[in-house]
Design a protein with these regions (language model features):
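Strand-loop microenvironment adjacent to phosphate/nucleotide-handling motifs in alpha/beta enzyme folds
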Residues: 30, 189-386
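Non-catalytic terminal and boundary segments that flank Rossmann-like NAD(P)-dependent oxidoreductase
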Residues: 1-39
Length: 386
């Protein structure tokens, strides 16, 4: 049986234990002080990062956990996972709701609860392919920016002690709409830092996260389909466990208006094709590198069930707008690399006036209301703001 955690540690991150364990241990008293007995709301908590965040923070014993997600099956699996994890503390008051955080029913629930001490938002479009046309782009901006602003307005009624919203390396020097939306999200939450404490984190790929290329390797094997991966793109990776720990540390230990990122050197980058090679070897296969998708599909369809040779296709990346490299900060941002052994912190982040954000969001909503709104119009508006 393939142990995904061990595979990630041995073949992708090249560390069997989390790089954030020392910082968690060094700050355990403060983490417990800030979390124990507090109420916790996690939006998008059924996803890979959200669920990992929950498992990272539960040992510090919040009194209440409410999880929101549109994925009903994901919430069911989250509950099974929590209850099946040996020794994991689960609050006596634990509830999940399948709903959209932008819906009126969420507002009603939030107001009845009179807010939460800790709020973490992981609900976001995450794939660069989500920007292929005007419909996809509008959905991306609606979710990552406009709905997120409405959430912040709602939180202002009952300000949390800690608010965290996940970002991405794509927000540093954005070159695509996904990155632009996340950069705008960062600007937006910083504008609300006068109302309550806000923090965020930029980090890279989460190995085998839901919907990722690597998670797709497992699906392809299960369906006896060929594997495909770019061979010219190097990426930083963290494990699912580490992704939750980054967010937990930033959320609880960060000062108002700070952005966190993992300390990962370029030597930690790895290609997807290299991971694919290691994945097949771990499963006991030799790869057959095919020249085309059609050749690979044919080979997979015709190979016997007990074949130890598996078809792959490696290619040059063609995802429009994908960055050829990753960066967690840009010149001009003030860095603190001393506070944590595993995390860097961007301090004194510049803040736009909230009135400027309000005007921009009004412009976006007016643009989306036009019957002939085009992708180019949205891109122009984003560029003008940034």
């Amino acid at each position: 049986m393939l142990n995904i955690d061990n595979f990630i540690g041995d073949n992708i991150t090249f560390r069997r234990s989390s790089m954030f364990v020392p910082d968690i241990a060094a700050n355990s008293d403060r983490l417990r002080q800030e979390v124990e007995g507090k109420s916790l709301l996690v939006i998008g908590g059924a996803g890979s990062i959200g669920s990992s965040y929950i498992k990272a923070i539960l040992p510090f014993k919040p009194s209440k956990l409410v999880v929101i997600d549109l994925n009903e099956n994901g919430l069911a699996e989250l509950t099974r996972d929590l209850r099946s994890t040996y020794g994991l503390y689960i609050p006596g008051e634990y509830r999940t709701y399948t709903l959209n955080f932008a819906d009126p029913i969420f507002e009603r629930m939030f107001r009845k609860e009179q807010g939460f001490d800790i709020v973490a938002n992981f609900s976001a479009h995450k794939h660069v392919r989500s920007e292929k046309d005007e419909y996809s782009v509008q959905a991306l901006i609606e979710n990552n920016v406009i709905k997120a602003k409405k959430l912040l307005d709602l939180l202002s009624e009952f300000p949390p002690r800690h608010f965290f919203c996940v970002s991405t390396d794509k927000a540093a020097n954005p070159v695509n709409i996904m990155g632009a939306s996340k950069r705008i999200m960062e600007d937006m939450i910083m504008a609300y830092s006068s109302k309550f404490k806000v923090t965020t984190a930029r980090f890279a790929n989460v190995a085998f996260s839901n919907g990722s290329l690597l998670a797709g390797f497992i699906d392809r094997i299960m369906k006896k389909q060929p594997l495909a991966a770019p061979n010219d793109v190097k990426r930083y990776f963290v494990s699912p466990e580490e992704s939750g720990q980054i967010c937990m540390l930033a959320c609880i230990l960060g000062n108002n208006g700070e952005i966190f990122f993992p300390k990962l050197g370029e030597e930690k980058m790895i290609t997807f094709s290299s991971i694919c090679d290691r994945f097949l070897r771990t499963l006991g296969y030799e790869k057959k590198e095919c020249a085309t998708d059609e050749e690979a599909r044919r080979y997979a369809a015709e190979m016997p069930d007990d074949s130890k040779i598996y078809p792959v296709v490696y290619f040059k990346s063609d995802t429009t707008g994908e960055k050829g490299y990753e960066e967690f900060y840009v010149p001009g941002e003030r860095l603190n690399l001393e506070r944590f052994s595993s995390l860097g912190v961007i301090e004194d982040v510049s803040k736009r006036p909230l009135s400027e954000l309000d005007s921009f969001f009004d412009e976006l909503e007016s643009l989306f209301a036009l019957p002939d709104c085009h992708k180019s119009d949205i891109v122009t508006a984003l560029k003008r703001f940034l």
